From Swiss-Prot:
It catalyses: adenosine(2085) in 23S rRNA + 2 S-adenosyl-L-methionine = N(6)-dimethyladenosine(2085) in 23S rRNA + 2 S-adenosyl-L-homocysteine + 2 H(+). This is rRNA adenine N-6-methyltransferase. Its EC number is 2.1.1.184. The lineage of its organism: Bacteria, Bacillati, Bacillota, Bacilli, Bacillales. Belongs to the class I-like SAM-binding methyltransferase superfamily. rRNA adenine N(6)-methyltransferase family.
């Protein structure tokens, strides 16, 4: 995505009072290293450097990089990188957390990037409220792919009045806690295929009629519109058994 489109999709939170309310829900300490997705005008960056060991802010807008650097002139535990987060290479040999107030229109791309291309153990994001709810919906492919790697929680509402320009909808602060992957490396491709066929209701491409009924019974599923992630994993495990 180009810089112009990113800039036009940005909504900033600048009130220290509102930022402090959001920060109370984020677990940080003086030993944490943080990657911030989009420093904006540096308001969250300033709070992060006061709480953490080191902050690396990744900002695509050159002018906002300079604004952030000027705002943090009295601090030396940070760097601002003028880069596109979707092209950024996260380190693989250090512990870190991620925070970001991310653009609505590339939320899916960003969340895929940081879950599958980073090793962050905790990820805090401000996202559109409807998007946050979709991340908990097992009828959505993105939710099913993410739930195999992270535990997803909605921590708090972020009212649209906090932002300028003010968006049309409210936002949420979400947390993604990394866990041991529920899908083995050798099964990743098979899992991705199963997810896509399942959410598109192409059941005949993954089960025979008898296999389907037996798998539902084994998973304890009575309603296809209301299944848990554990039940979905049970279906996938049945699929693997039938396709050895």
């Amino acid at each position: 995505m180009n810089e112009k489109n990113i800039k036009h999709s940005q909504n900033f939170i600048t009130s220290k009072h509102n930022i402090d309310k959001i920060m109370t829900n984020i677990r940080l300490n003086e030993h944490d290293n943080i990657f911030e997705i989009g420093s904006g005008k540096g308001h969250f960056t300033l709070e992060l450097v006061q709480r953490c060991n080191f902050v690396t802010a990744i900002e695509i807008d050159h002018k906002l990089c300079k604004t952030t650097e000027n705002k943090l002139v009295d601090h030396d535990n940070f760097q601002v990188l003028n880069k596109d987060i979707l092209q950024f290479k996260f380190p693989k040999n250090q512990s870190y957390k991620i925070f970001g107030n991310i653009p609505y229109n590339i939320s899916t791309d960003i969340i895929r990037k940081i879950v599958f291309d980073s090793i962050a153990d905790e990820i805090y994001l401000i996202v559109e409220y409807g998007f946050a709810k979709r991340l908990l919906n097992t009828k959505r492919s993105l939710a099913l792919l993410l739930m195999a790697e992270v535990d997803i929680s909605i921590l708090s509402m972020v009212p649209r009045e906090y932002f300028h320009p003010k968006p049309k909808v409210n936002s949420s602060l979400i947390r993604l806690n990394r866990k041991k992957s529920r899908i083995s490396h050798k099964d990743k491709q098979k899992y991705n295929y199963f997810v896509m066929k399942w959410v598109n209701k192409e059941y005949k491409k993954i089960f025979t009629k008898n296999q389907f009924n037996n798998s539902l019974k084994h998973a304890g599923i009575d309603d296809l519109n209301n299944i848990s992630f554990e039940q979905f994993l049970s279906l996938f495990n049945s699929y693997k058994l039938f396709n050895k």
